[in-house]
């Protein structure tokens, strides 16, 4: 039921609790209360793609997931948008679960001694939140948590996509994304 609600329930951007709302570097919620659904992930990921372009972040994006029930469907949704935007995505071999520090380390190692072609990352995790929750965090090229200037920008852009019924969100099928 939780995963079905992720795909079936559409957030109402006029209801504050159903909008994208970044806390500590990420957006968290549950598909049962319409605070973490596919539309949230599609909108946030497109906003990140635009942010990357505006900041000239054109290296690979490291995509990690954890063991929460909504992480795999959210990862699929994010990958469809990232691929449609031409972002090179790096994932753990065999789609293994990836803790946040592993993604941070991958970003730092990749960016070491680089001035251009920098990497960043998305981690699909609600961190310490309950099993029914999902979450998405964005790590910029410094490998750490995004500051409020970044998260506010992504949040505002994502909410504009929600308000426009995802108009402007690029997406291809998962099969094509692979």
Per-region residue spans from a language model:
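Gly/Ser-rich phosphate-binding catalytic loop and adjacent alpha/beta segment
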Residues: 1-178
